[in-house]
Amino acid sequence: MKPSSSNSRSKGHAKARRKTREELDQEARDRKRQKKRRGHAPGSRAAGGNTTSGSKGQNAPKDPRIGSKTPIPLGVAEKVTKQHKPKSEKPMLSPQAELELLETDERLDALLERLEAGETLSAEEQSWVDVKLDRIDELMQKLGLSYDDDEEEEEDEKQEDMMRLLRGN
């Protein structure tokens, strides 16, 4: 037995229904209305464009008429080659100023404290400390200062104070 052909058509896929004249006319009117609406809304340039396109998060909408503020050269500009400036040497400080800088150097103080605490420094740090201490010695000799003079003066003052005390004012 053959299955009936009428049953197979109805179960497979339904036949597309033809639209009536009224439905076709309504769709034509809708298409015509949409065609008239194409393009930008009137006044969109001055008003700042479409306000529903995510301007909710911005406080002030950006004016589309305002462009870049970078100046544009109007004529042919000559290429300017930059001349490399020679690196200027460090400004020469007076020996007194250089000595003050070295004495107040935080890195030098920290490394000297580590040395006094008994820590061993790396070769690079040790050489840096040696260079700085040598420079301090040179500057003190130039200025006529020495650590020994300060200690001797303090000892002299202590001896004078002792003598005054022994004499009994």
UniProtKB/Swiss-Prot annotation:
One of this protein's GO BP terms?
ribosome biogenesis
**Keyword Zinc assigned:** no
Stretches of Basic and acidic residues bias are at: 20-30, 160-169
Is rRNA-binding tagged as a keyword? no
Q: Where is the composition biased (Basic residues)?
A: 10-19, 31-40
Biased composition, class Polar residues, residue ranges: 49-58
Biased-composition ranges, Acidic residues, are 147-159
For this UniProt record, the keywords arranged alphabetically read as follows: GTPase activation, Ribosome biogenesis
Question: Which sequence ranges form a coiled-coil region, renumbered to this chain?
Answer: none
Look up the domain of life of the source.
Answer: Bacteria
- Name the HAMAP family on file: GAP_YihI
Q: Which family does it belong to?
A: Belongs to the YihI family.
Functional note: A GTPase-activating protein (GAP) that modifies Der/EngA GTPase function. May play a role in ribosome biogenesis.
Q: What is the protein's given name?
A: Der GTPase-activating protein YihI
Tell me the organism's taxonomic lineage. Bacteria, Pseudomonadati, Pseudomonadota, Gammaproteobacteria, Enterobacterales
Gene responsible for this protein: yihI
